[in-house]
């Protein structure tokens, strides 16, 4: 697959992304040997003085965002690498909560292309190296890496984390990570390091996580054992070995993820004031995570795509003050647990608007309908969303969920509507 015409530092980002997508024989190729060799050549294995690495089935993005928000409130210069993106590739790398220009990414890709020689890299490995290179150039205090898939063999794990975080463990990506929570837990705990904090937000922790912590000599900090949180009427309380923080502001991200981020921050030893914690928690929001875009009708975007996330989403919907119906625009990938995910939502959704997702992994609208037995079929996510918005009364809620791709399509349709495009 080599010898395609190689883009240059000044080539458009789209040309580079097309090149990267076709560079390696496999889309996913787990293992650290190839990517670590290139990282060593680029000298990016220590992208900042302090690194957090965040793994987990759900909640990684909002945990990273909370860490970023609090650390910035405390005066640190912070970089975050996350995936997948919703609308633009540049979302994947944030420096001080801002995306970098496309030209920065293409310059970085050119550096990696020059350094890799004959070593073949996947799209994700290339992107990870690029993020590390960009962070190194930015001279940051802290870098936060969101694991792409699993942990042990994920490209992010070539970097030694000063604090490792596992947010939650549920069944997803079983083809790659194993058939049960124990196998998945072992893979995710692969990011742990000797004598470093390993913070686990999953309340029902598989024993394999403790096994790996013991094998590696990591300092395991478990929710409900070493730290905990409790939601009160108008705030919440966090407690760990260092003491308690009372009357914290309720976060806009899921509560367990804000608490897990706080546990990781307090385990890090980084100087962070209580005021920075309060300010950072309040300002942390992330697109596509129970994102309320508008009211009358209320429009909510959520990337929930497995039963664990869908159950949380259903609970959030039940807690909203509402009098009208919930109209759900749904599109999913066929390798997800479609039946289990939809079953978690059925009690809170009144009408389903089923749409296909394109590409080899996309489920058809008909496949979704097989599980639901009711609803309407549309030819695209945008068409389903337009139909739901047209049907919605001011008191209703339109929910868009099922995949990052589904939410991205609606965001793009909203942008097109604002700019008068198609």
Spans of model-derived segments:
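ATP-dependent carboxylate-amine ligase catalytic core
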Residues: 7-8, 12, 26-28, 32-49, ...
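Nucleotide phosphate-binding/pyrophosphate-handling subdomain across enzymes
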Residues: 48-50, 137, 142-147, 154-165, ...
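A conserved segment at the C-terminal end of the G1
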Residues: 50-54, 62-79
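Beta-strand->loop->alpha-helix junctions that form or flank phosphate-binding loops
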Residues: 81-84, 200-202, 214-231, 248-252, ...
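Extended acidic/charged loop-beta regions that coordinate divalent cations
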Residues: 84, 88, 127-176, 207-244
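Membrane-proximal helix-turn-helix segments that form the acceptor-binding/catalytic region
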Residues: 185-194
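C-terminal helical cap/extension that packs against the catalytic core
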Residues: 199, 203-217, 232-235, 266, ...
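Active-site-proximal loop/hinge segments that shape catalytic or ion-binding/gating pockets
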Residues: 403
């Amino acid at each position: 697959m080599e010898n395609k015409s190689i883009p240059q530092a000044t080539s458009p980002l789209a040309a580079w992304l097309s090149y990267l997508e076709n560079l390696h024989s496999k889309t996913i190729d787990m293992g650290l040997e190839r990517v670590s060799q290139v990282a060593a050549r680029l000298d990016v294995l220590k992208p900042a003085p302090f690194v957090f690495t965040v793994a987990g089935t759900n909640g990684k993005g909002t945990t990273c965002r909370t860490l970023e928000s609090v650390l910035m409130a405390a005066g640190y210069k912070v970089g975050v690498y996350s995936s997948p993106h919703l609308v633009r590739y540049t979302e994947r790398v944030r420096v001080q909560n801002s995306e970098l220009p496309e030209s920065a990414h293409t310059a970085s890709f050119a550096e990696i292309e020059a350094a890799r020689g004959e070593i073949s890299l996947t799209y994700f490995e290339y992107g990870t190296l690029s993020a590390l290179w960009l962070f190194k150039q930015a001279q940051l205090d802290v870098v936060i890496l969101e694991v792409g898939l699993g942990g042990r063999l994920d490209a992010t794990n070539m970097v030694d984390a000063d604090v490792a975080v596992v947010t939650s463990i549920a069944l997803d990506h079983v083809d790659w990570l194993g058939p049960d929570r124990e196998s998945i837990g072992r893979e995710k705990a692969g990011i742990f390091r000797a004598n470093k904090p390993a913070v686990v937000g999953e309340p029902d922790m598989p024993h394999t996580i403790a096994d790996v912590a013991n094998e590696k000599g990591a300092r395991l900090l478990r929710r409900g054992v070493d730290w905990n949180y409790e939601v009160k009427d108008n705030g919440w309380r966090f407690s760990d070995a260092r003491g308690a923080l009372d009357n914290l502001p309720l976060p806009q991200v899921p509560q367990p993820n804000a608490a897990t981020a706080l546990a990781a921050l307090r385990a890090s030893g980084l100087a962070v004031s209580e005021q920075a914690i309060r300010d950072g928690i309040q300002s942390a929001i992330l697109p596509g995570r129970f994102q309320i875009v508008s009211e009358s009708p209320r429009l909510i975007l959520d990337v929930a795509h497995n039963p664990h996330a869908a159950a949380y989403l259903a609970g959030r919907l039940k807690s909203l003050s509402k009098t009208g119906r919930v109209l759900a625009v749904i599109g999913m990938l066929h390798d997800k647990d479609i039946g289990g995910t939809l079953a978690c939502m059925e009690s809170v959704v009144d009408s389903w608007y089923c749409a296909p997702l394109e590409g080899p992994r996309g489920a058809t609208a008909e496949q979704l309908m097989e599980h639901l037995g009711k609803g309407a079929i549309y030819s695209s996510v945008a068409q389903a969303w337009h139909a739901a918005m047209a049907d919605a009364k001011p008191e209703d809620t339109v929910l868009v969920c099922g995949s990052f791709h589904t939410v991205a399509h609606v965001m793009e349709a909203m942008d097109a509507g604002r700019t008068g495009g198609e």
